[in-house]
Amino acid sequence: MIPTFRIQIRRYLNTEVKRRLYAQCLNRDFDSLLAEVKGIPVSEMEESFVTLYLMKSAQFGHVPSLDYLWHKYVMRHHMIMVNPSLLCDIGNIALQEGKLFIPEQLSSHFMKFYGSNNEYEQYRYELLRIQVESFAKGTMEKTSFREKWKVFLQDLDHTVERDFQFSVRDFPHLTQALSGTDRELLLKMLFSEGKISVCNNSSLPMLLNMILLQEEFELEFKIKLFQNFYTIHRHLNYEDTVTILFKNCKGNGYRSIELMEFVRGNKITTPHLAYKYFLQSIIDSEYYFKAYDYMDLVKKYDGLLEQLRQQE
């Protein structure tokens, strides 16, 4: 009886069944497909189909399929080697959907098969970023921002090149976790050497930017904080910083002009978006006439010149 049973199992994936499975996958009938795949023995499943199914599940965000395929066919049975790009896609979906144990597994899978190849460095960074964000999101109030920042330093700051450019836009959950943190503690983290050293040139500016994005801090404090930080670290990249600050100055022409004088006086590189926020803030305030000092910039942005004329 046992040999007969095995013969029946091996005949499960006949041509008709394979055709149906591929059709369901390509037609995005994932719910029906998942139900059928769960009944197929691992020994009968083909690597090429699992790879296609995993790829399509990630492409169209079918979380139940991703969760099942990843844990059964990748983690438990090690059937397929997932390419770096797909690992990142799965990681972003896992982060979004709260599957917060998966990102660390993705990084381990990547390091096992691709870790020694510098060609895939961008994927390594992306997977580590997702891992850091996953920790920041998953632990919520249970873990302090200081601990979450330590994880960032250990997992990312210490592992990428010194001149790799971090951006606050890539870490929304870590930024959110900073809210409510004691002001004095943040100043200590920003200006004092901690137990874990900071290696990357953009890590501290990113921490500064995270602080500047917090609504709980007043604008005057933010501008002074930037000025004090800049006097210590003059040769770092502040493009994100000045953009955030000028956006914060919306409707406050006085502070906006004060900030611009500091930026120009120190010849700090300023991106076009920051200039646009600056001009908009003074045109919308009682200091609109100061915009005439920057007419070369006003003319570059659609609508600003007309707004200025309407203020006259």
Curated annotation (Swiss-Prot):
Localization per Swiss-Prot or TrEMBL: Mitochondrion inner membrane
Main subcellular location of this protein, as a coarse class: mitochondrion
Molecular function GO labels: translation initiation factor activity
TM spans (from-to): none
One Pfam family here: PET122
Gene Ontology CC terms, in alphabetical order: mitochondrial inner membrane
GO biological process, one term: positive regulation of mitochondrial translation
Record function comment: Required for expression of the mitochondrial gene for cytochrome c oxidase subunit 3 (COX3). PET122 seems to work by directly interacting with the small ribosomal subunit to promote translation initiation on the COX3 mRNA.
Protein name (Swiss-Prot/TrEMBL): Protein PET122, mitochondrial
Species assigned in the record: Lachancea kluyveri (strain ATCC 58438 / CBS 3082 / BCRC 21498 / NBRC 1685 / JCM 7257 / NCYC 543 / NRRL Y-12651) (Yeast)
Gene name for this UniProt entry: PET122
